[in-house]
């Protein structure tokens, strides 16, 4: 199995390095990751400037000022030859649950892999300690995929509780929960008196009931949520069409 491995925490982050070490025990792994933390970069691409890369002695590649999506795009289309069999993103330091997937560079890297035609996993740890647990879970899933490919055409967003492996209860297939809207902005002043702003933490849990990714992780399970790239709200199409007809938009300007 050939694996393109990326993340949004940066090429030297403990999550990606722990996972790369574990994956290399049974797979051909190419790390292509940002040279710095790009958390929250979502699906952004660098289009108005060139991208430089640096290759370390162990073969890992850092994309200077690159986003997670840049890294996967370059990895698939230029840097990994032959091309990968699968794209894996993570292990993220912190969860990507519920609405987090909108902003997550970890999920975005996997989404870019899927957009380019490859199976893809995004892996996050609900903490900053037991990366080995998340790595073991990921390796188990990838070994299973080698034996029997999963042909859903979807991204698997995997969240692992920050526990020793023997305390993980199992795996649940879940849906995304939701958070309350975030509203915190943290102002500061620089030495010259100019105001600086920091984006605050995410909103608290809103829909975290049974069946959600929040609930599974809180209860000590691994959460696997299938995600897809198509954002069309199919159930709303008829509602919008009926509304346009009723208000006359499109018939009178």
Swiss-Prot record:
Instruction: Please give the positions of the paired cysteines in each disulfide bond.
Output: none
Catalytic activity as recorded in UniProt: a ribonucleoside 5'-phosphate + H2O = a ribonucleoside + phosphate; a ribonucleoside 3'-phosphate + H2O = a ribonucleoside + phosphate; [phosphate](n) + H2O = [phosphate](n-1) + phosphate + H(+)
Would you name any one GO CC term? Answer: cytoplasm
The positions annotated for binding a divalent metal cation are 8-9, 39, 92
Q: What is its EC number?
A: 3.1.3.5, 3.1.3.6, 3.6.1.11
Q: What are the recorded GO MF terms, alphabetically?
A: 3'-nucleotidase activity; 5'-nucleotidase activity; exopolyphosphatase activity; metal ion binding; nucleotide binding
- Keywords assigned by UniProt, alphabetized: Cytoplasm, Hydrolase, Metal-binding, Nucleotide-binding
Cofactor(s) recorded for this entry are:
a divalent metal cation
**Stored InterPro entries:** SurE, SurE-like_Pase/nucleotidase, SurE-like_sf
Cofactor binding note:
Binds 1 divalent metal cation per subunit.
Entry's localization field? Cytoplasm
Family as reported in the entry's similarity comment: Belongs to the SurE nucleotidase family.
Q: Which PANTHER family does the annotation name?
A: 5'-NUCLEOTIDASE SURE, 5'_3'-NUCLEOTIDASE SURE
Q: Please explain the role this protein plays, according to its UniProt record.
A: Nucleotidase with a broad substrate specificity as it can dephosphorylate various ribo- and deoxyribonucleoside 5'-monophosphates and ribonucleoside 3'-monophosphates with highest affinity to 3'-AMP. Also hydrolyzes polyphosphate (exopolyphosphatase activity) with the preference for short-chain-length substrates (P20-25). Might be involved in the regulation of dNTP and NTP pools, and in the turnover of 3'-mononucleotides produced by numerous intracellular RNases (T1, T2, and F) during the degradation of various RNAs.
What is this protein called in UniProt? 5'/3'-nucleotidase SurE
